[in-house]
A protein has these predicted regions:
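Pepsin/retropepsin-fold aspartyl endopeptidases
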Residues: 1-149
Length: 149
């Protein structure tokens, strides 16, 4: 796991899970709505137990609707937006599907599409310990993403 920074929101040090099995990246969002004039509005990181006061509302006309399949084969439609991020020393635009990750330890999932040609993944190394993160924010889920596979 790593820490991600959203450059246009002045949001820093958000815990993110690297998942080379996932194609797309996902970010926790709440209050997602689409207006009649085509403006998508959502609260980035709103309501996630790890994010506290980081939440910010964002509106955009620059989005896509994509189909996402989870590891169990269930497919769902989601909105996908482009956000400028910093991961390590690199700043770049990345696409994220908007998802309810409130029951997941990590509010962000980093998939292959974002990592490809930018990073080499060392699976033996992590800058965040999942157990320490759960203790720090007093998170107890009966079944989280790591234990559910």
């Amino acid at each position: 796991a790593e820490r991600l920074h959203f450059m246009d929101f002045d949001i820093a040090d958000v815990p993110a899970k690297v998942d080379t099995g996932a194609y797309r990246s996902a970010v926790h969002a709440s209050d997602i709505s689409l207006s009649d004039d085509g403006v998508l509005t959502f609260t980035l990181l709103g309501g996630h137990p790890v994010c506290g006061t980081m939440a910010q509302t964002y509106s955009t006309k620059d989005f896509k609707i994509v189909w996402i399949a989870n590891s169990f084969g269930h497919r769902e439609q989601r909105y996908e937006v482009k956000l400028r991020v910093r991961l390590g020393p690199k700043v770049f635009p990345a696409t994220f599907s908007l998802a309810d990750r409130s029951k997941k330890i990590y509010p962000i999932l980093l998939g292959r599409k974002m990592l490809n040609s930018r990073f080499i993944v060392d699976t033996s190394n992590s800058s965040i310990n999942r157990i320490e993160l759960k203790k720090e924010y007093n998170i107890e889920f009966p079944l989280d993403e790591e234990e559910g596979r």
